[in-house]
């Protein structure tokens, strides 16, 4: 286990180096018409949804390390296929999207379960601290990769994917130096595994934690969808690409800082307080994007607030995972996290379909703000009264761990 802890943080940094993040849409548009670019995105999201839960079950059944090795190998292949693509290479780009989706699906939940299993009996606050450091390094890596990715666009866009292939290969090599964490129980057959996860949901704290994260996936993604138009309103067509790249870099740096605050916030305000503060911040951000449509000065405010769009997720990640994984059996940790992610993606898809009913961006953002406020009220209701955020409940099944 010492080898795992020795190489884990360098691995998480390398795994976060996706240099193509700020330029991938432009990269696609340079090779394909917009309609086919949207088809590529649909292929990616469909593959992620299809692989999300099976990859979690695979991790619980076969092992954490093999699952992460598959993830990194898929990312290497994906990046090389992207780099090799040329104008009109839809099939090659679609294959690259499939491998990219597999890479992210096989990482989802398994990285957290790997660290939690490695720490074994010492998990808890130690896991929370290490997960916070891991998350912080991941955001720092994303910030650095975004800055270099923008430079790659000027020099040679394919370089961003070649650098990503190299970093993913390096992460793969570090995984080879690690060992599979010992577990006394393996995952059951798929249907039985699903029944066990649903049984875990009978714990009031578990379903509240899962529901909160799934709902926040929706709220976190709204700024990603509507930030680009706000940046365009502020900087114009000519500079929107550069502005978006700089904005991404600073947003990731702030998220890295917030990730390190997670354990402190939890110890100071309790888990309920930390999650509610995260919900409140995102609600204010979504409301500011709506107000930005009406007033130019609010566009500046919204863009400034959007620098912190990843901070709530970063701050809540370690406390939330520590609380949830401590209540889940070792044979279904990755499956539960995958189900949580799948639920969030499904809710976000339904939200997009709902917003599409209104063709005007102003109306869409008004509805999104309304949904954010409703979720905030539900969070206050189910995570604890606003005046008693730090209160520790008496019954484990009815109260969130503080």
Regions found by a protein language model. Name each.
Residues 272-316:
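C-terminal transmembrane helical hairpin of 12-TM major facilitator-type secondary transporters
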Residues 1-50, 205-250:
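Helix-loop boundary and gating motifs at the non-cytosolic
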Residues 1-2, 178-211, 400:
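Juxtamembrane intracellular "pre-TM" segments in multi-pass secondary transporters
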Residues 73-88, 281-295:
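C-terminal ends and interior cores of transmembrane alpha-helices
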Residues 50-87:
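Conserved MFS/SLC helix-loop-helix module at the cytosolic interface between two early adjacent transmembrane helices
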Residues 117, 164-189, 383-395:
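Helix-loop junctions on the cytosolic side of multi-pass membrane transporters
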Residues 13, 78, 89-107, 299-315:
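Hydrophobic core of transmembrane alpha-helices in multi-pass small-molecule transporters
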Residues 98-139:
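Cytoplasmic helix-loop-helix junction between adjacent transmembrane helices
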């Amino acid at each position: 286990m010492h080898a795992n802890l020795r190489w884990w943080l360098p691995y998480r940094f390398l795994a976060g180096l996706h240099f193509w993040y700020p330029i991938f849409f432009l990269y696609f548009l340079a090779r394909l018409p917009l309609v086919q670019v949207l088809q590529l995105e649909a292929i990616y999201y469909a593959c992620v949804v299809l692989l999300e839960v099976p990859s979690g079950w695979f991790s619980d059944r076969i092992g954490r390390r093999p699952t992460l090795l598959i993830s990194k190998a898929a990312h290497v292949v994906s990046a090389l296929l992207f780099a090799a693509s040329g104008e009109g290479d839809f099939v090659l780009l679609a294959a690259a999207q499939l491998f990219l989706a597999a890479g992210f699906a096989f990482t989802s939940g398994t990285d957290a379960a790997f660290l939690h299993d490695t720490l074994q009996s010492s998990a808890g606050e130690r896991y929370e601290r290490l997960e916070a450091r891991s998350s912080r390094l991941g955001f720092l890596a994303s910030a650095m990769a975004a800055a270099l990715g923008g430079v790659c666009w000027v020099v040679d866009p394919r370089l961003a994917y070649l650098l990503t292939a190299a970093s993913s290969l390096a992460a793969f090599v570090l995984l080879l130096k690690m060992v599979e964490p010992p577990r006394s129980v393996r995952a059951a057959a798929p249907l039985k595994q699903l029944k066990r996860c649903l049984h875990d949901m009978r714990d009031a704290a578990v379903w509240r934690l899962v529901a909160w994260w799934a709902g926040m996936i929706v709220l976190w993604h709204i700024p990603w969808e509507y930030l680009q138009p706000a940046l365009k309103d502020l900087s114009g067509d000519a500079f929107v690409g550069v502005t978006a790249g700089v904005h991404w870099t600073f947003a990731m740096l702030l998220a890295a800082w917030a990730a390190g605050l997670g354990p402190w916030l939890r110890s100071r305000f309790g888990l309920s307080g930390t999650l509610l503060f995260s919900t409140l911040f995102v609600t204010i951000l979504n409301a500011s994007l709506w107000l930005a449509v009406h007033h130019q000065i609010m566009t500046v405010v919204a863009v400034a607030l959007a620098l912190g769009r990843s901070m709530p997720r970063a701050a809540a990640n370690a406390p939330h995972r520590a609380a949830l994984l401590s209540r889940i059996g070792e044979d279904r940790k990755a499956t539960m996290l995958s189900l949580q992610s799948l639920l969030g993606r499904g809710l976000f898809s339904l939200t997009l379909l709902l917003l599409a009913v209104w063709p005007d961006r102003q109306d869409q953002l008004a509805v999104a703000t309304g949904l954010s406020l409703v979720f905030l009220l539900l969070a206050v209701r189910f995570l604890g009264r606003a005046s008693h955020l730090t209160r520790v409940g008496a019954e484990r099944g009815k109260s969130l761990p503080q």
